[in-house]
A protein has these predicted regions:
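Catalytic core of tubulin tyrosine ligase-like
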Residues: 61-191
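Conserved beta-loop-beta/alpha segment of the NTase-like Rossmann-fold superfamily
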Residues: 1-70, 118, 122-123
C-alpha cells in the first residue's frame, strides 16, 4: 500500500524498509551503507537487501547466499543474490558462517518506488491490482475507507515470499554496523 501511496506523491522516490525491532550500534556505517544502496537503486531497476555479516551460527535468522564473484559494475560492495535460505538448524548455520558468502537476512530493503510497484505487478498481480485500483483515492477523504474495505482482499504474504525470492534483479549489500534483531528478551539482554 505505502509504495503506491508514495508513488502517487513522488514517482521517482526511493524507499528504505526496515523492521522496527532492531538495534543499530554503528549509525555512521549504517548511514553509509543505506546511502550507497539508495544511490544504486536510484540508478537501476534493482532491489537491494542488506545482508548482515554473521558473527555466530544463528538458527533464528534467515540467510542470504550471495554470489561474491559478480559484484555490480556500479558498486563493488553490492552483489547478486544466489538464493534466500530459511532459518537453518545449528549444523547448517555453522556451515554457512564458515563460508564468506552467507549473510543474515535483516529484512532491510532498499528500492525505487517504480521498481517495487513493477515487481508487485509481475510477481503479485492480485495485490498490485488492489492498490492500482486506488490510485484516484490516495490523498483524499475516501482513502482510509477504501483501504479498510480492500486491504483484507489481499493475499496474506510477506514481501520476502511475494517479491524477494522471485525477483531477478535482486542484490545484497553485505554490512556490519552492529545490527541485532531485538525480537526476543534474550537478544535484548545481549545489548
Amino acid at each position: 500500500y505505502v509504495s503506491w501511496r508514495i508513488k502517487a506523491k513522488d514517482p521517482k522516490a526511493n524507499i528504505v524498509v526496515t523492521p522496527s525491532d532492531a538495534i543499530v550500534l554503528n549509525v555512521p556505517e549504517f548511514r553509509r551503507v543505506i546511502t550507497q544502496s539508495l544511490k544504486f537503486t536510484s540508478e537501476t531497476d534493482a532491489i537491494v537487501t542488506l545482508g548482515i555479516k554473521p558473527n555466530r551460527p544463528e538458527t533464528g535468522y534467515g540467510y542470504i547466499q550471495a554470489d561474491l564473484s559478480t559484484s555490480s559494475p556500479r558498486n563493488k560492495e553490492i552483489f547478486r543474490i544466489d538464493t534466500f535460505r530459511e532459518k537453518p538448524d545449528l549444523e547448517t548455520a555453522k556451515r554457512y558462517i564458515q563460508q564468506n558468502n552467507f549473510f543474515w537476512n535483516a529484512g532491510i530493503f532498499v528500492w525505487s518506488v517504480s521498481t517495487i510497484v513493477n515487481a508487485f505487478r509481475i510477481y503479485a498481480p492480485a495485490i498490485s491490482k488492489v492498490f492500482e485500483g486506488l490510485l484516484n483515492v490516495y490523498g483524499t477523504d475516501k482513502e482510509q475507507e477504501m483501504i479498510d474495505k480492500l486491504y483484507p482482499e489481499c493475499e496474506k504474504i510477506s514481501v520476502d515470499y511475494a517479491i524477494m525470492e522471485k525477483a531477478e534483479e535482486i542484490f545484497v549489500c553485505p554490512a556490519d554496523f552492529g545490527w541485532s534483531d531485538l525480537g526476543s528478551w534474550s537478544s535484548l539482554l545481549m545489548h
